[in-house]
């Protein structure tokens, strides 16, 4: 640039660091059904179906409360392995829980689908692969 070449040689500014987002993902099951929901029409993974999830990280003891359920509505909660998914500009660091319900409920604006419907009708984004492979 001192030589006056700065205007002739293109300069690529360094890439911004990806934003890290903590997320908690839930596999909510009742008998042979699994809860899913549709994402908002704008933003990341717009209008796609997903496993229910929330921003941030929560502990197993607070899962029923986070889902808006009473403890008697939840048969058990199992901590699942952590997972990571990298998008171009954001990175999800995910904690997962399997939540088995004692009665059919639809928390977090979800609806229940059979495992067969999940496999053949409702495609879930690759971001959830670490958890979708644990269903069924």
Question: Where are the regions a protein language model picked out?
Answer:
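Intrinsically disordered, low-complexity, charged terminal extensions of DNA damage-control enzymes
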Residues: 1-136
